[in-house]
């Protein structure tokens, strides 16, 4: 069992709809290994996103986080 963080974040993604720009937020939840947490955090912040929730989780990467 690896030490993982269950991260829920919100990242703005820009989509073009008939010349006007609409801002659309994308929410996602993923398991991030303990060692890669800082890099993941930087990536989300750089994209202008917001980290909503962080929980400690145990398990394997690649499993559906909706089932945890």
Swiss-Prot record:
Residues 2-57 form the CpcD-like domain. It is a peripheral membrane protein. It comes from the Bacteria. The gene is apcC. GO terms for biological process: photosynthesis. The keyword Membrane applies. GO terms for cellular component: phycobilisome; plasma membrane-derived thylakoid membrane. This is Phycobilisome 7.8 kDa linker polypeptide, allophycocyanin-associated, core. It is found in: Cellular thylakoid membrane.
């Amino acid at each position: 069992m690896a030490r993982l963080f269950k991260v829920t974040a919100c990242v703005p993604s820009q989509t073009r709809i008939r010349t006007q720009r609409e801002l659309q937020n994308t929410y996602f939840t993923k398991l991030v290994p303990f060692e890669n947490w800082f890099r993941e955090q930087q990536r989300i912040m750089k994209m202008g996103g917001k980290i909503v929730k962080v929980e400690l989780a145990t398990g394997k990467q690649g499993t559906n986080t909706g089932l945890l």
